[in-house]
Amino acid sequence: MAIERTLSIIKPDAVAKNVIGQIYARFEAAGLKIVAAKMVHLSRGEAEQFYAVHKERPFFKDLVDFMVSGPVMIQALEGEGAIAKNRDLMGATDPKKADKGTIRADFADSIDANAVHGSDAAETAAVEIAFFFPGMNVYTR
């Protein structure tokens, strides 16, 4: 399996619960390296631009409202099969359907406040990482 990078966002609900460290520990235990990280409070424009792919979906406004409701922790993760590994760690989008021991099962409250975002493919990972971390801010280690 190849070394990949993926984008991860710890959403406002999980930041408010003070579980960033617990989530980071799961990334690292799974062999993922955090190669870039920052805490930000997204502007409405940033959230709308980042989630533009969902603009026509009925949940778009609620998603944007949620993502600007508090600070988020954004990180680029790197490792063998990082995209699939992170998605396995996150669990199903709906925490009620997420496997026990996944981030969403343990820390999320609802399908809307579902604790984390992760890139779904190599192409989206590249776009999402570039959105938040221009090349000079990502460090291979």
UniProtKB/Swiss-Prot annotation:
<feature type="binding site">
    <location>
        <position position="104"/>
    </location>
    <ligand>
        <name>ATP</name>
    </ligand>
</feature>
<comment type="similarity">
    <text>Belongs to the NDK family.</text>
</comment>
<feature type="binding site">
    <location>
        <position position="11"/>
    </location>
    <ligand>
        <name>ATP</name>
    </ligand>
</feature>
<keyword id="KW-0460">Magnesium</keyword>
<dbReference type="GO" id="GO:0004550">
    <property type="term" value="F:nucleoside diphosphate kinase activity"/>
</dbReference>
<dbReference type="GO" id="GO:0005737">
    <property type="term" value="C:cytoplasm"/>
</dbReference>
<dbReference type="GO" id="GO:0005524">
    <property type="term" value="F:ATP binding"/>
</dbReference>
<keyword id="KW-0547">Nucleotide-binding</keyword>
<comment type="subunit">
    <text>Homotetramer.</text>
</comment>
<keyword id="KW-0546">Nucleotide metabolism</keyword>
<protein>
    <recommendedName>
        <fullName>Nucleoside diphosphate kinase</fullName>
        <ecNumber>2.7.4.6</ecNumber>
    </recommendedName>
</protein>
<dbReference type="InterPro" id="IPR034907">
    <property type="entry name" value="NDK-like_dom"/>
</dbReference>
<dbReference type="GO" id="GO:0006183">
    <property type="term" value="P:GTP biosynthetic process"/>
</dbReference>
<keyword id="KW-0808">Transferase</keyword>
<keyword id="KW-0479">Metal-binding</keyword>
<dbReference type="GO" id="GO:0006228">
    <property type="term" value="P:UTP biosynthetic process"/>
</dbReference>
<feature type="active site" description="Pros-phosphohistidine intermediate">
    <location>
        <position position="117"/>
    </location>
</feature>
<dbReference type="GO" id="GO:0006241">
    <property type="term" value="P:CTP biosynthetic process"/>
</dbReference>
<keyword id="KW-0418">Kinase</keyword>
<keyword id="KW-0597">Phosphoprotein</keyword>
<keyword id="KW-0963">Cytoplasm</keyword>
<keyword id="KW-0067">ATP-binding</keyword>
<feature type="binding site">
    <location>
        <position position="93"/>
    </location>
    <ligand>
        <name>ATP</name>
    </ligand>
</feature>
<dbReference type="InterPro" id="IPR001564">
    <property type="entry name" value="Nucleoside_diP_kinase"/>
</dbReference>
<dbReference type="InterPro" id="IPR036850">
    <property type="entry name" value="NDK-like_dom_sf"/>
</dbReference>
<dbReference type="Pfam" id="PF00334">
    <property type="entry name" value="NDK"/>
</dbReference>
<feature type="binding site">
    <location>
        <position position="114"/>
    </location>
    <ligand>
        <name>ATP</name>
    </ligand>
</feature>
<feature type="binding site">
    <location>
        <position position="59"/>
    </location>
    <ligand>
        <name>ATP</name>
    </ligand>
</feature>
<comment type="function">
    <text>Major role in the synthesis of nucleoside triphosphates other than ATP. The ATP gamma phosphate is transferred to the NDP beta phosphate via a ping-pong mechanism, using a phosphorylated active-site intermediate.</text>
</comment>
<dbReference type="GO" id="GO:0046872">
    <property type="term" value="F:metal ion binding"/>
</dbReference>
<feature type="binding site">
    <location>
        <position position="87"/>
    </location>
    <ligand>
        <name>ATP</name>
    </ligand>
</feature>
